A protein has these predicted regions:
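Divalent metal-coordination and catalytic microenvironments
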Residues: 5, 13-16, 37, 68, ...
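Active-site mouth loops of central-metabolism enzymes
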Residues: 13-24, 83-99
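Metal-dependent catalytic neighborhoods of phosphoester/phosphodiester hydrolases
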Residues: 26-27, 50-59, 302
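Divalent metal-dependent hydrolysis catalytic cores, especially in the metallo-beta-lactamase
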Residues: 29-51, 65-73, 109-121, 130, ...
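Metal-cofactor-binding active-site regions of metalloenzymes
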Residues: 64-89
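Active-site neighborhoods of metal-dependent hydrolases
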Residues: 103-117, 121, 166, 170-325
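Acidic, glycine-enriched loop/beta-strand segments at the rims
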Residues: 310, 328-333, 342-378
Length: 398
């Protein structure tokens, strides 16, 4: 293939996807990712009974699909947020240390590539999960548990998602508020996990942002210089850049499974019931810039298909938001290539274009270092050494 006058970059990652969150998308996702130049994905949580078949299908010999790395279910606490009753089934409970050890053994046996700790775990269970993951050689991802301070979590995990709950440690007296949250998390009334988490977010998120303490926040970020932050700005800051206001949104919907496209098309003007207040979106953009200035590594992930995150397409929106937040185009590209490889200890095999590296490549018609939006100008993809031209990529989607 003649690439004269075009631009070659390493294959892109979406570092935060959910293959099983909405099963209308599961079968279509591999083609949608490749169609947009995403050659590797990290599935950050779902039940094994749903995720394993999807992973096995993607990994089967001859499959035209991205590389996939998966975590299995979210490792939550006594009260599970994504419990399958009040929220989609993504998590499992770890009410005590013995259960946590048993769950880690089961996930390791199932062949997970990493594990993800969720928001309702206790400090005691968190410590056990960290110990087990380290003993088993499994990288750790997660949200900052509501029972803990971000500065006590970051040094023990390799990545954190959504900037979640970091604002609660960026105040003058975070120890007092974490003690308050622990009292609420005792949950004597047995409130469902998802409801309990939402109550705590409402009670502490915006007040913490309003009480921002720069000295305290710098201390928090100093603890995270070896922890990849995956801010999912296209989700956190959805109100600042709704995808359905873009001129190409109709083309995006046309590639999606018909039932999901119809639903998104009907609800997009209302933000799907999401808030249009920009306090948290603005904070998210501010915090990513502060992290960038503080030397905290940033990874690019979307949370697709949550929050109008069209698989594949949304990764380019995330790169644009990272640049808007203060990263250079090169740094944004590293967030979708080098950083994910580093998480898995694969920086000697993936993430850059060098002899001997895995053959995952994307050919663009424009230079993304001049304009990050040009990562959308995909002309061809090499996935696992196989070349797919534009016609072949378009044939992967409806």
């Amino acid at each position: 293939m003649d690439g004269s006058g075009q631009y070659l970059i390493p294959g892109l990652w979406d570092f935060h996807v959910h293959l099983a969150y909405d099963q209308r998308f599961t079968e279509a996702m591999p083609g949608l990712f490749l169609n947009h130049g995403i050659t590797s994905i990290r599935d950050t949580g779902g039940p094994l009974e749903l995720v394993l078949p999807a992973v096995e299908s993607i990994r089967r010999e001859g499959a035209v699909a991205p590389r996939v790395f998966f975590a299995g279910p979210l490792l939550d606490g006594e009260h599970v947020v994504y419990d399958g009753d009040n929220m989609p089934l993504l998590g499992i409970g770890n009410p005590d240390e013995a259960t946590a050890r048993a769950n880690m053994a089961r996930l390791d046996e199932a062949g997970v590539d990493f594990v993800k700790i969720y928001e309702m775990v206790s400090p005691e269970v968190f410590a056990v999960l960290v110990e087990e993951a380290q003993a088993r050689g499994l990288p750790m991802d997660g949200h900052v548990p509501l029972s803990m301070q971000a500065r006590d979590v970051g040094p023990h995990v390799q990545s954190l998602e959504h900037l979640r709950n970091i604002e609660m440690d960026c105040i003058a007296n975070p120890r007092a508020t974490v003690a308050e949250r622990r009292l609420v998390l005792a949950n004597p009334e047995g409130v469902p996990g998802g409801t309990l988490r939402s109550q705590l977010h409402r009670a502490y998120r915006i007040p913490s942002i309003e009480a921002y303490d720069e000295v305290g926040c710098r201390e928090v970020l100093a603890s995270m210089t070896s922890t990849i932050q995956v801010p999912t700005l296209r989700l956190n800051a959805l109100a600042l850049q709704p995808p359905f206001t873009r001129a190409d949104w109709g083309e995006v919907l046309a590639k999606l499974p018909e039932d999901a496209a119809a639903e998104w098309g009907a609800m997009d003007g209302s933000m799907g019931g999401r808030s249009t207040d920009t306090t948290y979106p603005d904070w998210s953009m501010f915090l990513v810039n502060l992290m960038h200035e503080s030397g905290v590594p940033i990874g690019a992930g979307t949370d697709t298909p949550i929050g109008f995150a069209a698989p594949g397409y949304s990764l380019h929106s995330e790169l644009e938001m990272l640049v808007r937040a203060g990263l250079s185009p090169m740094e944004a590209l590293r967030a979708a290539t080098v950083r994910p490889a580093e998480f898995f200890g694969l920086e000697g095999e993936m993430g850059t274009i060098e002899p001997g590296r895995l053959a995952d490549l994307v050919l663009l018609s424009g230079n993304p270092l001049d304009d990050i939006t040009l990562t959308r100008s995909v002309q061809a993809v090499v996935t696992k050494g196989h070349l797919l031209n534009r016609a072949a990529l378009d044939a992967l989607v409806r």
